[in-house]
Regions:
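Short amphipathic alpha-helices and their capping/turn segments at secondary-structure boundaries
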Residues: 19-23, 43-57, 85-88, 137-146, ...
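Acidic-and-aromatic substrate-binding clefts and catalytic sites of carbohydrate-active enzymes
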Residues: 7-16, 33-46, 68-78, 105-111, ...
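Short, hinge-like loop/turn segments at secondary-structure boundaries
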Residues: 22, 48-50, 80-81, 145-147, ...
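N-terminal pre-domain/capping segments
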Residues: 1-84, 151-154, 179-183, 188, ...
Length: 279
Protein backbone atom coordinates (compact mmCIF):
# COMPACT_ATOMS: atom_id res chain seq x y z
CA UNK A 1 0.00 0.00 0.00
CA UNK A 2 1.20 3.49 -0.89
CA UNK A 3 0.51 6.26 1.62
CA UNK A 4 -0.36 9.57 -0.01
CA UNK A 5 -1.85 13.00 0.54
CA UNK A 6 -4.40 15.21 -1.19
CA UNK A 7 -2.12 18.23 -1.53
CA UNK A 8 -4.75 20.73 -2.69
CA UNK A 9 -5.70 21.51 0.91
CA UNK A 10 -2.34 23.24 1.54
CA UNK A 11 -2.52 26.31 -0.75
CA UNK A 12 0.23 28.31 0.97
CA UNK A 13 2.58 26.55 -1.46
CA UNK A 14 2.22 26.05 -5.20
CA UNK A 15 1.29 22.64 -6.56
CA UNK A 16 4.87 21.87 -7.55
CA UNK A 17 6.18 23.11 -4.21
CA UNK A 18 3.68 20.84 -2.44
CA UNK A 19 4.77 17.84 -4.49
CA UNK A 20 8.39 18.40 -3.50
CA UNK A 21 7.61 19.27 0.14
CA UNK A 22 5.38 16.30 0.91
CA UNK A 23 7.64 13.87 -0.93
CA UNK A 24 10.43 15.05 1.35
CA UNK A 25 8.17 14.39 4.35
CA UNK A 26 7.99 10.73 3.39
CA UNK A 27 4.70 10.43 1.52
CA UNK A 28 4.76 7.70 -1.15
CA UNK A 29 2.10 9.39 -3.27
CA UNK A 30 0.57 12.80 -3.93
CA UNK A 31 -2.87 13.60 -5.30
CA UNK A 32 -3.43 16.74 -7.37
CA UNK A 33 -6.87 18.27 -7.88
CA UNK A 34 -7.96 18.13 -11.51
CA UNK A 35 -8.64 21.86 -11.58
CA UNK A 36 -5.00 22.39 -10.55
CA UNK A 37 -3.62 19.78 -12.93
CA UNK A 38 -5.37 21.31 -15.94
CA UNK A 39 -3.30 24.54 -16.06
CA UNK A 40 -0.13 22.53 -15.48
CA UNK A 41 -0.97 20.47 -18.57
CA UNK A 42 -1.22 23.71 -20.56
CA UNK A 43 2.23 24.90 -19.43
CA UNK A 44 5.16 22.96 -20.87
CA UNK A 45 7.64 24.16 -18.26
CA UNK A 46 5.41 23.19 -15.33
CA UNK A 47 4.51 19.91 -17.02
CA UNK A 48 8.14 18.92 -17.41
CA UNK A 49 8.92 19.97 -13.84
CA UNK A 50 6.04 17.92 -12.42
CA UNK A 51 7.13 14.83 -14.35
CA UNK A 52 10.71 15.37 -13.19
CA UNK A 53 9.65 15.64 -9.54
CA UNK A 54 7.53 12.50 -9.71
CA UNK A 55 10.38 10.51 -11.20
CA UNK A 56 13.15 12.04 -9.10
CA UNK A 57 11.29 11.64 -5.79
CA UNK A 58 10.09 8.15 -6.67
CA UNK A 59 6.47 8.88 -5.76
CA UNK A 60 3.13 7.98 -7.30
CA UNK A 61 0.88 10.64 -8.83
CA UNK A 62 -2.91 10.54 -8.74
CA UNK A 63 -5.26 13.19 -10.11
CA UNK A 64 -8.75 13.76 -8.70
CA UNK A 65 -11.30 15.52 -10.89
CA UNK A 66 -15.07 15.62 -11.47
CA UNK A 67 -17.29 14.19 -14.17
CA UNK A 68 -19.44 16.91 -15.82
CA UNK A 69 -21.31 19.07 -13.33
CA UNK A 70 -24.55 18.38 -15.22
CA UNK A 71 -25.69 17.04 -18.59
CA UNK A 72 -25.65 20.44 -20.31
CA UNK A 73 -23.68 20.84 -23.52
CA UNK A 74 -21.49 23.46 -21.86
CA UNK A 75 -20.53 21.23 -18.92
CA UNK A 76 -19.90 18.19 -21.09
CA UNK A 77 -17.81 20.17 -23.57
CA UNK A 78 -15.70 21.67 -20.78
CA UNK A 79 -15.23 18.25 -19.20
CA UNK A 80 -14.10 16.66 -22.47
CA UNK A 81 -11.65 19.49 -23.17
CA UNK A 82 -10.03 18.96 -19.77
CA UNK A 83 -9.88 15.20 -20.24
CA UNK A 84 -8.24 15.74 -23.63
CA UNK A 85 -5.53 17.84 -21.97
CA UNK A 86 -4.99 15.16 -19.32
CA UNK A 87 -4.75 12.60 -22.11
CA UNK A 88 -2.14 14.59 -24.04
CA UNK A 89 -0.08 15.05 -20.88
CA UNK A 90 -0.35 11.36 -20.05
CA UNK A 91 0.68 10.27 -23.53
CA UNK A 92 3.83 12.36 -23.19
CA UNK A 93 4.81 11.77 -19.55
CA UNK A 94 2.99 8.54 -18.55
CA UNK A 95 3.08 9.63 -14.90
CA UNK A 96 -0.58 9.63 -13.78
CA UNK A 97 -1.09 6.34 -11.96
CA UNK A 98 -4.78 6.91 -11.15
CA UNK A 99 -7.21 9.44 -12.60
CA UNK A 100 -10.32 9.53 -10.39
CA UNK A 101 -13.62 11.37 -10.55
CA UNK A 102 -16.29 12.67 -8.22
CA UNK A 103 -19.83 12.06 -9.46
CA UNK A 104 -22.22 14.87 -8.57
CA UNK A 105 -25.94 14.39 -8.04
CA UNK A 106 -27.21 15.97 -11.33
CA UNK A 107 -25.49 13.30 -13.48
CA UNK A 108 -25.75 10.17 -11.32
CA UNK A 109 -28.67 8.99 -13.46
CA UNK A 110 -26.39 8.49 -16.49
CA UNK A 111 -22.59 8.62 -16.27
CA UNK A 112 -21.75 5.88 -18.78
CA UNK A 113 -20.83 8.11 -21.76
CA UNK A 114 -18.54 10.23 -19.59
CA UNK A 115 -16.54 7.41 -18.03
CA UNK A 116 -16.36 5.65 -21.39
CA UNK A 117 -14.91 8.84 -22.88
CA UNK A 118 -12.19 8.97 -20.22
CA UNK A 119 -11.25 5.32 -20.71
CA UNK A 120 -11.05 5.82 -24.46
CA UNK A 121 -8.98 9.00 -24.36
CA UNK A 122 -6.60 8.68 -21.39
CA UNK A 123 -3.91 5.99 -21.78
CA UNK A 124 -1.57 4.26 -19.31
CA UNK A 125 -3.52 5.01 -16.12
CA UNK A 126 -6.18 3.44 -13.96
CA UNK A 127 -9.54 5.21 -14.00
CA UNK A 128 -11.66 5.33 -10.83
CA UNK A 129 -15.03 6.64 -9.71
CA UNK A 130 -15.47 7.87 -6.16
CA UNK A 131 -18.32 6.26 -4.21
CA UNK A 132 -20.36 5.41 -7.30
CA UNK A 133 -22.27 2.14 -7.54
CA UNK A 134 -23.93 2.29 -4.11
CA UNK A 135 -27.28 1.32 -5.65
CA UNK A 136 -28.32 -1.27 -8.22
CA UNK A 137 -29.26 1.48 -10.67
CA UNK A 138 -25.78 2.97 -10.41
CA UNK A 139 -24.07 -0.39 -10.74
CA UNK A 140 -25.96 -1.11 -13.95
CA UNK A 141 -24.32 1.95 -15.52
CA UNK A 142 -20.83 0.48 -15.07
CA UNK A 143 -21.64 -3.22 -15.50
CA UNK A 144 -20.06 -3.22 -18.97
CA UNK A 145 -16.70 -2.27 -17.44
CA UNK A 146 -16.24 -5.42 -15.33
CA UNK A 147 -13.82 -6.88 -17.85
CA UNK A 148 -11.80 -3.66 -18.09
CA UNK A 149 -8.79 -3.99 -15.80
CA UNK A 150 -8.17 -0.24 -15.93
CA UNK A 151 -11.49 0.61 -14.26
CA UNK A 152 -12.19 0.53 -10.54
CA UNK A 153 -13.23 2.43 -7.44
CA UNK A 154 -12.00 5.23 -5.26
CA UNK A 155 -13.62 4.61 -1.87
CA UNK A 156 -13.82 7.47 0.62
CA UNK A 157 -13.72 5.97 4.13
CA UNK A 158 -14.92 9.23 5.69
CA UNK A 159 -18.05 9.07 3.53
CA UNK A 160 -18.46 5.35 4.20
CA UNK A 161 -18.25 6.06 7.93
CA UNK A 162 -21.15 8.53 7.65
CA UNK A 163 -23.19 6.13 5.52
CA UNK A 164 -22.76 3.43 8.12
CA UNK A 165 -24.04 5.72 10.86
CA UNK A 166 -27.06 6.30 8.63
CA UNK A 167 -27.83 9.81 9.89
CA UNK A 168 -27.61 11.70 6.60
CA UNK A 169 -30.25 11.50 3.89
CA UNK A 170 -32.54 13.62 1.67
CA UNK A 171 -30.65 14.32 -1.53
CA UNK A 172 -27.15 13.57 -0.29
CA UNK A 173 -26.43 10.45 -2.31
CA UNK A 174 -22.88 9.96 -1.07
CA UNK A 175 -24.07 9.99 2.53
CA UNK A 176 -27.20 7.82 2.25
CA UNK A 177 -26.79 4.49 4.01
CA UNK A 178 -26.17 1.68 1.54
CA UNK A 179 -27.52 -1.62 2.91
CA UNK A 180 -25.28 -3.48 0.46
CA UNK A 181 -22.33 -2.08 2.38
CA UNK A 182 -23.70 -2.34 5.90
CA UNK A 183 -26.92 -1.77 7.86
CA UNK A 184 -26.99 1.57 9.67
CA UNK A 185 -25.48 1.34 13.13
CA UNK A 186 -24.59 3.67 15.98
CA UNK A 187 -20.96 2.57 16.01
CA UNK A 188 -19.55 0.77 12.97
CA UNK A 189 -17.29 -2.19 13.76
CA UNK A 190 -14.37 -3.76 11.95
CA UNK A 191 -16.75 -6.43 10.63
CA UNK A 192 -18.98 -3.70 9.20
CA UNK A 193 -16.07 -2.17 7.29
CA UNK A 194 -14.88 -5.59 6.13
CA UNK A 195 -18.36 -6.33 4.81
CA UNK A 196 -18.45 -2.96 3.06
CA UNK A 197 -15.14 -3.45 1.30
CA UNK A 198 -15.93 -7.03 0.33
CA UNK A 199 -19.26 -5.94 -1.17
CA UNK A 200 -17.51 -3.97 -3.90
CA UNK A 201 -17.71 -5.58 -7.34
CA UNK A 202 -14.76 -3.67 -8.83
CA UNK A 203 -11.15 -3.36 -7.66
CA UNK A 204 -10.45 -0.52 -5.23
CA UNK A 205 -7.58 1.47 -6.71
CA UNK A 206 -7.53 4.32 -4.20
CA UNK A 207 -8.91 5.16 -0.77
CA UNK A 208 -9.51 8.61 0.69
CA UNK A 209 -9.05 8.75 4.45
CA UNK A 210 -10.20 11.46 6.87
CA UNK A 211 -12.18 11.57 10.09
CA UNK A 212 -15.53 13.12 11.06
CA UNK A 213 -18.24 13.00 13.72
CA UNK A 214 -20.24 10.28 11.98
CA UNK A 215 -22.79 12.83 10.75
CA UNK A 216 -21.10 15.63 8.78
CA UNK A 217 -18.40 15.39 6.11
CA UNK A 218 -15.84 17.38 8.09
CA UNK A 219 -12.59 16.06 6.60
CA UNK A 220 -10.90 16.17 10.00
CA UNK A 221 -7.33 15.23 10.81
CA UNK A 222 -7.01 11.67 12.10
CA UNK A 223 -6.65 12.65 15.75
CA UNK A 224 -10.04 14.42 15.70
CA UNK A 225 -13.53 13.00 15.21
CA UNK A 226 -14.83 9.53 16.04
CA UNK A 227 -13.40 7.36 13.26
CA UNK A 228 -11.38 4.49 14.76
CA UNK A 229 -8.26 4.90 12.64
CA UNK A 230 -6.42 1.88 14.08
CA UNK A 231 -9.45 -0.26 13.26
CA UNK A 232 -9.40 1.02 9.68
CA UNK A 233 -5.69 0.18 9.39
CA UNK A 234 -6.39 -3.35 10.66
CA UNK A 235 -9.25 -3.75 8.17
CA UNK A 236 -7.03 -2.72 5.26
CA UNK A 237 -4.42 -5.24 6.40
CA UNK A 238 -7.11 -7.92 6.64
CA UNK A 239 -8.25 -7.38 3.05
CA UNK A 240 -4.60 -7.12 1.94
CA UNK A 241 -5.18 -3.72 0.37
CA UNK A 242 -2.36 -2.90 -2.04
CA UNK A 243 -3.61 0.27 -3.66
CA UNK A 244 -3.09 3.91 -2.74
CA UNK A 245 -4.26 5.38 0.56
CA UNK A 246 -4.68 9.15 0.21
CA UNK A 247 -5.18 11.19 3.37
CA UNK A 248 -7.75 13.89 2.57
CA UNK A 249 -7.86 15.98 5.74
CA UNK A 250 -8.97 19.47 4.73
CA UNK A 251 -7.76 22.24 7.05
CA UNK A 252 -9.67 25.48 6.60
CA UNK A 253 -12.68 23.93 4.87
CA UNK A 254 -15.08 22.68 7.54
CA UNK A 255 -12.89 23.64 10.49
CA UNK A 256 -10.49 26.46 11.22
CA UNK A 257 -6.86 25.68 10.63
CA UNK A 258 -4.33 27.75 8.70
CA UNK A 259 -0.60 27.65 7.94
CA UNK A 260 1.69 26.94 9.79
CA UNK A 261 -0.64 24.92 12.03
CA UNK A 262 -2.01 23.03 9.01
CA UNK A 263 1.46 21.71 8.16
CA UNK A 264 2.07 20.62 11.75
CA UNK A 265 -1.30 18.90 11.97
CA UNK A 266 -1.04 17.00 8.69
CA UNK A 267 2.45 15.76 9.51
CA UNK A 268 1.15 14.62 12.90
CA UNK A 269 -1.76 12.89 11.14
CA UNK A 270 0.71 11.11 8.87
CA UNK A 271 2.70 9.91 11.88
CA UNK A 272 -0.52 8.62 13.47
CA UNK A 273 -1.38 6.73 10.30
CA UNK A 274 2.08 5.20 9.98
CA UNK A 275 1.89 4.02 13.60
CA UNK A 276 -1.52 2.47 12.95
CA UNK A 277 -0.43 0.71 9.78
CA UNK A 278 2.88 -0.36 11.30
CA UNK A 279 5.14 1.44 8.88
Amino acid sequence: MKNGLAIWHYPHRSVLENVAFFAEQGFDSVSILGYHMDPICADEQQSAELARLINEKGIVLTVHHKLPLDHSEESVSSFKATVDRFAAWQRKYKSIDILSFDVLEPIRDCITPYIDYVLEKVPFSKIALEDFGLTERERQQIEHLKSNERFGYLIDIGHMHIRMHGKRHEGETLMINSPDECPATEQPTAEDFLRAFRSKEFPIFEIHLHSNDGITDLHYFLDDGVLDVKMIADVLKEIDYRGILTIESAPGCMFRCAYPESDKRILKTYEIWKQCIGK
